Design a protein with these regions (language model features):
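C-terminal motif of bacterial Sec signal peptides marking the signal peptidase cleavage site
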Residues: 2-4
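Alpha/propeptide regions of enzymes that mature by internal proteolysis
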Residues: 9-342
Length: 342
């Protein structure tokens, strides 16, 4: 059974330019997205599923690009793009979130504004259809940066969010992944195999993320995930952690991470890329390569990032067999890829 996507595109952009520094319009803008990195091998992917991923990546990035082209903000583009990916069960975020050890779904997300360094994050929510929207509301409507669990959902209700029945997040493929991991645990008598996800026969990390540069020169980044299959004890990965899974700073770059969260937290991946650009004076591509190809593997982790700098240069760096990814520039040139050797 092929996982499906909801193609109802919910554009958050209302046609009004709300970017900062409107007087300094520029033509350079761009957007980059990812749908997760991991052991994604072509021989384990059938044509139908591969096409579904490619189509959804293209659909999602065009939502954000349309907003940017019309003069919308990078924050608007990032939130709307991730929102659309959360509504697609192909990805481990929102509708397609993986199951915890207990058979529930715990969702995480974060977003950051490169112009102000304001940020919002949420972790461990079970009744929020689009966690990226709640992360944005936490940034805009609360005095805090990060809320979790029941408290985050109480805040969401106060802000007018509708609570979603947990059955909405159920997909047969994700349940099969959980059951397979539990079977492996029993055979190996392993304490926890949360890092092994047999979905599409391989371990992979289906986090979704987006980074964007708007016409006003403002950067933004966002990330959303269901975490790791079979996670326990309210485990939180890098996706909702500002500086690890998400970071944006107008003076350097915007970064969204995907990978083995424990290592990305320890390496503070997203912020480290920005810091290397700021303090060492190296390019985005150089910084991303050092962090993803050296620092993260040296700790024992794997995964990848997408990033864009203040000049519109991009990076799609990963140390796994594949990463669902796409990029679109101001000229409308589109690149969509899945595997390493493309």
């Amino acid at each position: 059974m092929l996982l499906s996507c909801n193609n109802d595109q919910k554009h958050h952009f209302k046609g009004e330019i709300s970017s900062k520094n409107n007087s300094k319009k520029q033509e350079t803008f761009g957007i980059v997205i990812h749908g997760g990195a991991g052991t994604i091998l072509k021989q384990n992917m059938n044509d139908s599923l591969e096409n579904a991923y490619l189509e959804k990546l293209e659909e999602a990035i065009k939502i954000g690009h349309t907003i940017l082209r019309a003069g919308g903000t990078s924050l608007e583009a990032v939130s709307a793009t991730i929102n659309s990916m959360e509504d697609c069960s192909l990805f481990n975020a929102g509708k397609g979130a993986v199951f915890t050890h207990e058979g529930t779904n715990e969702l995480d997300a974060s977003i950051m504004d490169g112009a102000t360094l304001n940020a919002g994050a949420v972790s461990g929510v079970k009744h929020i259809k689009n966690p990226i929207d709640l992360a944005l509301s936490i940034m805009n409507d609360s005095p805090h940066v990060m809320l979790s669990g029941e408290g985050a959902e109480e805040f969401a209700r106060e802000q007018g969010f509708k609570m979603t029945d947990p059955s909405y997040f159920y997909t047969e493929k994700r349940m099969q992944s959980l059951q397979k991991i539990k079977e492996i645990e029993l055979r190996k008598k392993h304490k926890s195999l949360s890092f092994e996800d047999p979905f599409i026969k391989d371990s992979k990390f289906g986090t979704v993320g987006c980074v964007a540069l708007d016409k006003n020169g403002n950067l933004a980044a966002g990330t959303s995930t269901g975490g790791m299959t079979n996670k326990r004890w309210n485990r939180i990965g890098d996706a909702p952690i500002i500086g690890a899974g998400t970071y944006a700073n107008n003076s350097t770059c915007a970064v969204s991470s995907t990978g083995w969260g424990e290592f990305f937290i320890r390496a503070m991946v997203a912020h480290d890329i920005s810091a290397m650009m700021e303090y060492k004076g190296i390019t985005l591509q150089e910084a991303a390569k050092i962090v993803i190809q050296q620092k993260v593997p040296d700790l024992g982790g794997d995964g990848g990032i997408v990033a864009i700098d203040k000049d519109g240069n991009i990076a799609m760096e990963f140390n796994t067999a594949g990463m669902y990814r796409a990029h679109m520039n101001a000229k409308g040139e589109l690149i969509v890829k899945i595997y390493k050797d493309e």
